[in-house]
Amino acid sequence: TPLSADDCEVPFYKDIHLSAGNGFSDDIEDYNGYKLRFSKSTLRRHGINPADVVCVCADGDSMEPVFPDGATLGINTADKVIKDGKIYAVNHGGLLRTKILQKLPDNKIRIKSYNSEAYPDEEADADEINIIGRVFWWSVIV
């Protein structure tokens, strides 16, 4: 289907493999050519540049019940400054993780999951975590 003037297509990294690096393009090695569509005006209304959006699949149950394993996540790769309680995609020790982040004293970060019974809070030095971007959207088929 042709794109309307208000539509944009963003990369959908369905199968990803992380490598060591400092930014999303360095962290993600596999791009399969898939794309998802978003409304440009909706993204702009929320302060998101369409060129900064990528989508990935959630892996695991640590963020249930908010989003389950396999949910599709929209990430704003330009939004890397931690706002306490927001959800971010991060490269932590070579693992792509989707977690709630909270700033702590002494350059530490608390890493939280919604499924906190199975995944207790963690702490890490800020320099151990590469923030890929803030999760601004997700889609789930129930």
Where do the PLM segments sit?
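Short, positionally conserved secondary-structure boundary motifs
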Residues: 1-69, 132, 137-142
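Short, hydrophobic/aromatic-rich segments at coil-to-beta transitions
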Residues: 50-55, 83-88, 110
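Short, surface-exposed secondary-structure edge patches
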Residues: 62-66, 78-81, 126
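Structural motif
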Residues: 71-72, 86
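Short, compositionally biased
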Residues: 85-97, 103-107
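Amphipathic alpha-helical interface segments
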Residues: 113-142
